[in-house]
């Protein structure tokens, strides 16, 4: 997490708690010439457009008062969607037995990306059951090698 996203999270998290929303993710990216602050929120039963609008208004007010971002940017508040990021310990626990996509910093068994069913989670590793050709195999992945993890939609 970058310094900017950490600072934004400190500002936004109490606002989301007051609204009874979960702050799922904060991402600050540059795409072409534009900068985007993307904030994913959720709540029991999911968020709708009205929830995102309300959260966006509250976040805008707070960021205007104490903005850690020096350049102009677009604020995007949305649901995390079906491919929700997996970052926190509880996210990993909730994803057990579900399809996940994991990107790695370094290859494991020659691959830097794995798609499969999350089988196990502990402090050091996760185990993802993957299909290779017609066989299933458990891949043990050290948590410190995970660049990104998210829920996956498997068809």
From Swiss-Prot:
NCBIfam families: PRK00092.1-2 (NF000928). One of its GO terms (biological process) is ribosomal small subunit assembly. Pfam families: DUF150_C, RimP_N. This is Ribosome maturation factor RimP. Required for maturation of 30S ribosomal subunits. Keywords: Cytoplasm, Ribosome biogenesis. HAMAP family: RimP. PANTHER family: RIBOSOME MATURATION FACTOR RIMP (PTHR33867:SF1). It is found in: Cytoplasm. One of its GO terms (cellular component) is cytosol. Belongs to the RimP family. Its main location: cytoplasm. The keyword Cytoplasm applies. The lineage of its organism: Bacteria, Bacillati, Bacillota, Bacilli, Bacillales.
């Amino acid at each position: 997490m970058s310094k900017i996203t950490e600072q934004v999270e400190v500002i936004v998290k109490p606002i989301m708690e007051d609204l009874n929303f979960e702050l799922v993710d904060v991402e600050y990216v540059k795409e072409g010439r534009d900068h985007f602050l993307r904030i994913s929120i959720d709540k029991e039963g999911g968020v709708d457009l009205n929830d995102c609008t309300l959260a966006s208004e509250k976040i805008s007010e707070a960021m205007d008062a104490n903005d850690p971002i020096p350049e102009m940017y677009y604020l995007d508040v949305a649901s995390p969607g079906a491919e929700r990021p997996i970052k926190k310990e509880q996210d990993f626990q909730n994803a057990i037995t579900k399809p996940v996509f994991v990107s790695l910093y370094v290859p494991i068994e020659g691959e830097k990306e794995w798609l499969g069913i999350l089988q196990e989670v502990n402090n050091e590793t996760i185990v993802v059951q993957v299909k290779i050709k017609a066989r299933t195999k458990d891949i043990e992945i050290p948590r410190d090698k995970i660049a990104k993890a998210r829920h996956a939609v498997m068809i």
